[in-house]
């Protein structure tokens, strides 16, 4: 019916106990293409940024099925991390996109509908940290406030490995 959603590259939710505290870990890898999943005309779909729209649907589904199932999640330890394949509005001083660009849909959803905090942005406001060779930040770590208060530092590590593999 067109309303169904599939998380093409996968997502997972694990609960682990550390020091007597339960931590919810959500990992993900969203759709990487400019065109929508199963688009018949990939070029046209890409021009319409339908890949961004599809990723936003994946993100809503992931959040609805994980943190969205727990009424008091904002007071618990939650972390969501992975390859979001999407840029964030907080980095738009680097990208220079129009404010209504669909590229922001994924992170706009997270910031507007969940208690998650982008920890790299929070710890390094205004200090852009790319996560890809092409100069974009598409890999993110989000946390709820209680878990974030335990963080001492966070940054993108550039150790040479990414130069040998593809973004």
Describe each region flagged by the PLM.
Residues 22-48, 81:
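Active-site-proximal beta-strand elements of phosphoester/diester hydrolases
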Residues 68-79, 86-167:
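Metal-dependent phosphoester-hydrolase catalytic domains
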Residues 46-54, 97-101:
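Alpha-helix N-cap and loop-to-helix initiation/capping positions
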Residues 1-33:
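Structured beta-strand-rich core segments of catalytic domains in phosphoester-bond hydrolases
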Residues 10, 42-43, 155-160:
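Short intrinsically disordered coil segments
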Residues 17, 24, 50-85:
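His/acidic metal-ligating clusters that form di-metal
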